[in-house]
A protein has these predicted regions:
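Conserved N-terminal beta1-alpha1 strand-loop-helix module at the mouth
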Residues: 1-97, 108-132, 137-208
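ATP-grasp fold ATP-binding core
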Residues: 100-102
Length: 208
């Protein structure tokens, strides 16, 4: 079994999410490694979880840490393939590391998309994947047109505006590399309501 597109799961903080998503053959699984963040995962819990998993790659997710601190932290998490950051200025300081890079950007208005369109060729040149998230924008035509233009110039993971009803049409309409979904908190250990995440992944399952 496989999924119809490249899928990253972000902020995984429990074994229920991790095992379910691995079983659904997602490509990347992200863990927040920044102490103080509500989704922070300690090296011990990371190892405990990843010891159960196979067949996918791991992303260390950071919001505000300096690159030196990011690289130091990453040493204590065995098996990371990617680092996810939010600051464009940090890219040059991490390019020569052994990690692939994902730049996560929060899109509050179309001006940010215009800025990213100008930056996209540089991201492609440096093999940086662009992850777009938003709590405020809808996937209206203007927004989709800009995302399409960006995705034609660099690899884009779309992380907002997705649901089980529109995911198939969006993948046909936009030349994106894939999508990004978020894990969530367990109701209690071992019990999890997957809701939209599971609905979307089930739509993306390839039929044998």
């Amino acid at each position: 079994m496989a999924l119809k597109t490249f899928v990253k799961i972000s902020t995984v903080n429990n074994l229920s999410d991790a095992r379910y998503c691995a079983g659904m053959y997602v490509n990347l699984m992200g863990f927040n490694l920044e102490e103080g963040n509500k989704d922070y995962l300690s090296p011990e819990k990371y190892k405990e979880m990843t010891d159960w998993l196979s067949g996918l790659e791991y992303v260390g997710e950071f919001e505000a840490s300096h690159p030196d601190a990011i690289l130091e932290t990453a040493k204590t998490y065995e098996g990371l393939s990617y680092l996810q950051i939010t600051e464009e200025l940090h890219i040059p300081m991490l390019l020569n590391s052994s990690f692939n890079l994902i730049l996560k950007q929060e899109i509050n208005d179309v001006n940010i998309l215009q800025h990213l369109l100008a930056k996209a060729p540089s991201l492609k040149e440096n093999n940086v994947i662009l992850l777009l998230e938003s709590d405020s924008l809808d996937l209206k035509d203007e927004v989709k047109d800009l995302i399409k233009a960006i995705a034609e110039k660099c690899k884009v993971l779309l992380g907002f505006g997705l649901d089980a009803d529109n995911i198939s049409s969006l993948l046909e309409e936009l030349p994106i590399e894939g999508i990004a979904l978020k894990g969530g908190d367990e109701i209690k250990p071992g019990f999890k309501d997957f809701d939209e995440l599971a609905d979307i992944l089930e739509v993306l399952e390839e039929e044998d």
